[in-house]
Amino acid sequence: MYFFLVQCLYGDYMNLIYEDKKIKIVDCNTFFSRLKGFMFKKDIQHALLFNKCNSIHTFFMKSNIDVIMCDRDNNILYYYNNLSKNKIIFPKKNVDKTIELPVNFFNIKINTKVRID
């Protein structure tokens, strides 16, 4: 039921895979889903994908998040661990997509790849 509601609010969900772990990821492909993101959410159980996004903010967030910024080929260019609320990540060069996810779900290393299925 939870993922049905997530799909209704945000859009389609897939799997984000890194090394041998995976988590559900929702493609935020509507204006509302991109605007809301994880704002006002306490319990984060999935990841969010923002295509064509090279900057984010954490205003109005209730919990910390991890942020992965990738190029078009899903190479990890930037990784922000345990990003707290009321922060801004200014635009980064060569970033094509941004992924927000629960804190410490993956042990991310720069210059590796994520897979989205």
Language-model features: locations:
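Compact, glycine-rich, soluble single-domain proteins
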Residues: 5, 9-117
